[in-house]
């Protein structure tokens, strides 16, 4: 019997699964919440206040995930570690950290623990927007070809704007860093003791391509003179394709996890992209939505097309032999959680408690009794900026049509609908750019738990939606890549299509559009597009308001 382990490092926790290599059966799962969660107000040790739009993490939390979840899998199943042939990991991205020459994160060194820029910058760290704006302006002026691969704009969430922020605001941290690395690649570095960067993280998040490499030293010098040789000084390390073996588990990490030294370790992956084989997708025309705090949209293509506002397209970035496309929405589950935590009245909290259900479930039940358009509400889903297709973290959310009779469930439904409209806009943009999308798949917590949301997505997109058979698709995907890293000789696979066919899975559930609802959503979506054009491109009132807010925040901070 052969097994692999997949570990998925999410926004708030890490989860691991132990999977049977031949059948894809998930024998056990284990979850570890991050002790420091998201650090977005104060630094953990010093209490130092952080500016707005910051989102940091502590890398020690990631090691705790490995230390607790993997032994838990072994304990739950009784599987002999000698039968575990490989391990794969995936991570949120772009999530980066500066490290020293031994691989130690700078924030874990006493001399840097009071330095905010020494910590992990989480994917939703949006404080680098002005640096992204500058990068995009220079790239446009210089006619840099790489911009087209990223839909015409580099997001503030990606690596280089975040590094620019470090270089400008904390040059001593930039200089002290031996390397700046994706958290995904850092975990693999810890597991096997050698630094091998992933073509997935480098391609989608760091402006690297298999054919052209990184942009030139001259370009980086224009961003910041200290960054001229960044690719040699800070981004060094060989780049390897997903599906390859990065190395073997070290003695130290074997002791930490309970696995055997020499266990195959896969090249790191990104949480969205790794989920593709977990739902059995191995060919173009099928878009997968990974729906959680945010949503990532990924799909395969026969060739590279330029798609406005996409996050990126990378040859062999998702599966070998295909162009892998990515788009996304910065705020989906976070969107709904914000409303539940800040806007739901006590009476609804009490009703949910009496019914022994969560507030999300209560609101979904109530909202499900409404017809599309019945509330007269329309929202823009930009509570955390817009990733695709406008690529602007400085845009903010909006709700239109409220009256004194508006109810919480109506607002909740409008927020859900707004995220569905955003997904439809992404789908249409791909299609208009020559990338076919014939089938829609969904994975993640929302797809797993909320039929109300998924039916709205089916109605808004007017497409059937198939659902992942695993509640932890990224972890299953990582386990599949762990089987590839081990190879057929060790009981794994040499072919991703065979691995996906045997280990990937779907539920027997398909959400089918309601024709009557879809007709109403055609009208509502047309109005949504008008709002997107006006507030996203014509009137910059959202940005002006944000500027005033930040000035007032800075002024208040100085007084305190």
UniProtKB/Swiss-Prot annotation:
Recorded GO MF terms: ATP binding; D-ribulokinase activity; ribulokinase activity
Catalyzed reactions per annotation: D-ribulose + ATP = D-ribulose 5-phosphate + ADP + H(+); L-ribulose + ATP = L-ribulose 5-phosphate + ADP + H(+)
Organism of provenance: Bacillus subtilis (strain 168)
Pfam annotation, one family: FGGY_C
Pathway: Carbohydrate degradation; L-arabinose degradation via L-ribulose; D-xylulose 5-phosphate from L-arabinose (bacterial route): step 2/3
Keywords: Arabinose catabolism, ATP-binding, Carbohydrate metabolism, Kinase, Nucleotide-binding, Transferase
CDD domains per the UniProt record, alphabetical: ASKHA_NBD_FGGY_L-RBK
Protein name as annotated: Ribulokinase
